[in-house]
UniProtKB/Swiss-Prot annotation:
GO terms for biological process: fatty acid biosynthetic process. It is an enzyme of class 2 (transferase). It comes from Vibrio atlanticus (strain LGP32). This is Holo-[acyl-carrier-protein] synthase. NCBIfam families: acpS (TIGR00516), pantethn_trn (TIGR00556). It is found in: Cytoplasm. Belongs to the P-Pant transferase superfamily. AcpS family.
Length: 126
């Protein structure tokens, strides 16, 4: 296996919380897929969840080499958790096309947060 792409992002949780206060659920819906939004609606710490998803999707877009541009949107990335709580990244639409074209066979995602920040790293392997 060879590294196809690597991306990291950090998000300030308070900044995301302020954006949520200003824009309400519209901001969350711009970032989250439908299934992620369902989880979001049930949480007490919505800003923390959204900051972690935002950082993960930005990291994934950087690993692809596109950023959130060139036809790649936040909805092209979906984060879920396996039965042990490990984050799992799924690619859709344009992000999936680009990953397939680059020979990506394996996707690794790690997300962490503390009081002020959420950080994520994505590794794509062939």
């Amino acid at each position: 296996m060879a590294v196809v792409g690597l991306g990291t992002d950090i998000a300030e949780i308070e900044r995301v919380e302020k954006a949520l206060s200003r824009s309400g659920e519209a901001f969350a819906q711009r970032i989250l897929t439908d299934s992620e939004f369902e989880v979001f609606q049930q949480l007490k710490q919505k800003g923390r969840y959204l900051a972690k998803r935002f950082a993960a999707k930005e990291a994934a877009s950087k690993a692809l080499g596109t950023g959130i541009a060139l036809g790649v949107t936040f909805h092209d990335f979906e984060i879920s958790n396996d039965e042990h709580g490990k984050p799992v990244l799924s690619l859709h639409k344009k992000a999936r096309e680009i990953a397939d074209a680059s020979g990506t066979k394996s996707i690794h995602l790690t997300i962490s947060d503390e009081r002020h920040y959420a950080v994520a790293t994505v590794l794509l392997e062939s």
